[in-house]
């Protein structure tokens, strides 16, 4: 089976979040199930800088007003189609924001162009290759199925994955003419959304199947609390909605071989984590004692519950724990966490910014990772924690709920517990979870059981890829 995947970011070429990890890992995992994937992404400067030996596959003299070329290249096991359109993508800043951190005003056109190019490839305009199915990711690619509906494109099946419904690609109605869609596309059954143009909404209405990145999140987005205004649209498509948990690259995230980890280890050699623990203490200026080290590796935002972490830092220290934080985000939260470190030298350490090697070492050396997200479609850091024996303490929401088995009495007795869940997502809820963790930590046999059971969890892409392959096959066989 041939699949065209369409994404605004793909690891390892360009990444701002978990979307890139999925777009980079899923195509490789799908190969084992007979799925050949070509992934279309924009030609940002960071992408164009690293690709080599690219071949021109398709040219657009006028892609929504600008020239563009589709280049094909192989890169680290991925078959990539790069949309080289300098007018859209060759600019300073990131994929979505300018150097001042503001949305590019023409983001609607930049990602409509990506979607239109994808629909043309789906129609067979690229010589020698035509997909059997199109898989799009988030609002930036969601217009693909809209273009496929209204342009003379073969009725190929399409799948839209929602990685985070908070990001919807909503624009004023004045941009509609620039999309070059027929006038009758501006309806509630397509992209019209309360008088505006909704990219994600249009994809939800026109894709043949919709997936989210965990079963619990699939249920949550049907509610007003988590649906972000689109719960009614999703409810109308509930029979086509599937929750499939993400995996991680277990070759990259492997404590037995990870080049960043100072001392390698596995389930039978957990004592080797001690050297990594000492490295963490040295980096963050912590006292080198036996107190449990709780870590946070996250964007420092309200959605991630970082205000709660800042507010309970004093209590964690008072209970006898230590806390280390790696991340960046809202200035007020950065300041509050840095203030905690100043109040508690040797017990709290904070590093502002993102440091990929340190994120690996923290998973390999800290005792538990705290993930108090108010909503979390899937989450990856808890999967890394499971893999590395860094016990996850998570909010009971989204993919966190689906991937971490709470250490309640029944789960402990059955020896299946892998972490600690808490609800509600409040200071009280988090502190109760940390008290439970402190209690378990005092019983080294019980704590080791939690670590080992987590490390046994299958967090690879294999199961997820199998489910995607089955979904693809069912859609193709129906001739949609």
UniProtKB/Swiss-Prot annotation:
UniProt enzyme class: transferase
GO-annotated molecular function: alpha-1,4-glucan glucosyltransferase (ADP-glucose donor) activity; alpha-1,4-glucan glucosyltransferase (UDP-glucose donor) activity
Pathway: Glycan biosynthesis; glycogen biosynthesis
GO cellular component: cytosol
Catalytic activity: [(1->4)-alpha-D-glucosyl](n) + ADP-alpha-D-glucose = [(1->4)-alpha-D-glucosyl](n+1) + ADP + H(+)
Example GO biological process: glycogen biosynthetic process
Record InterPro entries: Glyco_trans_1 (IPR001296), GS/SS (IPR011835), Starch_synth_cat_dom (IPR013534)
Assigned keywords, A-Z: Glycogen biosynthesis, Glycosyltransferase, Transferase
Binding-site residues for ADP-alpha-D-glucose, renumbered to this chain: 15
CDD domains in alphabetical order: GT5_Glycogen_synthase_DULL1-like
Keyword Disulfide bond belongs to the record: no
Protein EC: 2.4.1.21
Free-text function comment from the UniProt entry: Synthesizes alpha-1,4-glucan chains using ADP-glucose.
Family: Belongs to the glycosyltransferase 1 family. Bacterial/plant glycogen synthase subfamily.
Protein name per UniProt: Glycogen synthase
Species annotation: Rhizobium johnstonii (strain DSM 114642 / LMG 32736 / 3841)
């Amino acid at each position: 089976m041939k699949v065209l995947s369409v994404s605004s970011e793909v690891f390892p070429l360009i990444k701002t979040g978990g979307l890139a990890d999925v777009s980079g890992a899923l195509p490789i995992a799908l190969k084992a199930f007979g799925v050949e994937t070509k992934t279309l992404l924009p030609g940002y400067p960071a992408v164009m800088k690293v690709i080599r030996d690219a071949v021109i596959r398709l040219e657009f003299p006028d892609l929504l007003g600008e020239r563009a070329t589709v280049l094909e290249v192989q890169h680290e096991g991925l078959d990539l189609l790069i949309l080289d359109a300098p007018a859209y993508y060759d600019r300073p800043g990131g994929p979505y924001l300018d150097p001042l951190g503001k949305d590019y005003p023409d983001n609607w056109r930049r990602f409509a162009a990506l979607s239109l190019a994808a629909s043309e490839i789906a129609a067979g305009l690229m010589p020698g290759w035509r997909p059997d199915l199109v898989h799009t990711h988030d609002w930036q690619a969601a217009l693909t199925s809209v273009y496929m509906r209204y342009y003379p494109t073969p009725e190929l099946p399409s799948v839209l994955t929602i990685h985070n419904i908070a990001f919807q690609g909503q624009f004023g109605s004045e941009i509609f003419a620039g999309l070059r869609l027929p006038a009758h596309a501006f309806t509630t059954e397509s992209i019209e959304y309360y008088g505006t143009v909704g990219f994600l909404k249009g994809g939800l209405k026109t894709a043949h199947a919709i997936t989210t990145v965990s079963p619990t999140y699939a249920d949550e987005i049907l509610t007003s609390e988590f649906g972000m205004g689109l719960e009614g649209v999703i409810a109308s498509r509930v029979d086509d909605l599937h929750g499939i948990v993400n995996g991680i690259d277990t070759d990259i995230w492997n404590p037995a071989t990870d080049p960043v980890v100072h001392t390698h280890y596995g389930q039978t050699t957990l004592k080797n984590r001690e050297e990594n623990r000492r490295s963490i203490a040295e980096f963050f200026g912590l006292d080198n004692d036996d107190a449990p080290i709780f870590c946070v590796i996250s964007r420092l935002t309200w959605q991630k519950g970082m205000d709660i972490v800042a507010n309970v830092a004093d209590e964690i220290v008072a209970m006898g724990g230590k806390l280390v934080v790696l991340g960046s985000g809202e200035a007020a939260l950065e300041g509050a966490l840095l203030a905690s470190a100043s109040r508690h030298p040797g017990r709290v350490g904070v590093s502002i910014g993102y440091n990929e090697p340190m994120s690996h070492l923290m998973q390999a050396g800290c005792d538990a990772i705290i993930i108090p997200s108010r909503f979390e479609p899937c989450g990856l850091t808890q999967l890394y924690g499971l893999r590395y024996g860094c016990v996850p303490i998570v909010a009971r929401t989204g993919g966190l709920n689906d991937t971490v088995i709470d250490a309640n009495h029944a789960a402990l007795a059955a020896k299946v517990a892998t972490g600690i869940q808490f609800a509600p997502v409040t200071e009280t809820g988090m502190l109760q979870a940390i008290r439970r963790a402190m209690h378990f930590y005092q019983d080294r046999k019980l704590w080791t059981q939690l670590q080992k059971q987590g490390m046994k969890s299958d967090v690879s892409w294999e199961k997820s890829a199998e489910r995607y392959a089955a979904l693809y096959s069912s859609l193709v066989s129906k001739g949609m």
